[in-house]
């Protein structure tokens, strides 16, 4: 597991290099400052095979506060139109808004509830049905998630206050 976490931190750092600054990397999560948005990002435990989409999840924070803790997930498969996409954090379910292979939280109240649930630790999974009607789940470990969320939020708050450029 430690090798996986170290590998993820390296991947996050490399990916962020081209598109932002890594603020934190630990556990299975990283916080990245992209200038117009700061994100806490995690990768699914299921590693995508070559040519397939890697499932990721994250929380977005914008200095102008248009988005503050917005949850988003890139699904490993395209969700069947009209089907439910549900985020499970521990035993708590959250119905997400979805289009194609992306899903989002539905607003500030749900976003805060998701962040509170993530702080409780444990596991997280995004469940949906693919175009063929087959149910799938993209699982995530939450180790490092709370720190990544706090780091991303703090970084964007500093940017909004003019403390960093």
Could you describe each region identified by the protein language model?
Residues 13-15:
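N-terminal signal peptide c-region/cleavage motif recognized by signal peptidases
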């Amino acid at each position: 597991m430690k090798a996986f976490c170290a590998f993820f931190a390296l991947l996050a750092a490399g990916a962020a290099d081209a598109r932002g600054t890594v603020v934190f990397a630990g556990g299975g999560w990283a916080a990245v400052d992209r200038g117009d948005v700061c994100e806490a990002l995690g990768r699914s435990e299921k590693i995508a095979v070559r040519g397939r989409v890697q499932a990721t999840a994250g929380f977005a924070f914008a200095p102008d506060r248009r988005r503050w803790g917005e949850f988003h997930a890139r699904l490993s498969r395209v969700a069947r139109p009209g089907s439910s996409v549900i985020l499970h954090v521990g035993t708590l379910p959250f119905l997400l808004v979805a289009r194609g292979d992306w899903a989002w939280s539905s607003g500030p109240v749900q976003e805060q509830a998701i962040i509170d649930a993530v702080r409780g630790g444990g596991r997280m999974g995004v469940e949906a049905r693919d175009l063929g009607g087959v149910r799938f789940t993209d699982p995530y470990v939450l180790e490092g998630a709370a720190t990544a969320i706090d780091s991303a939020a703090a970084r964007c708050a500093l940017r909004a206050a003019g403390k960093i450029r």
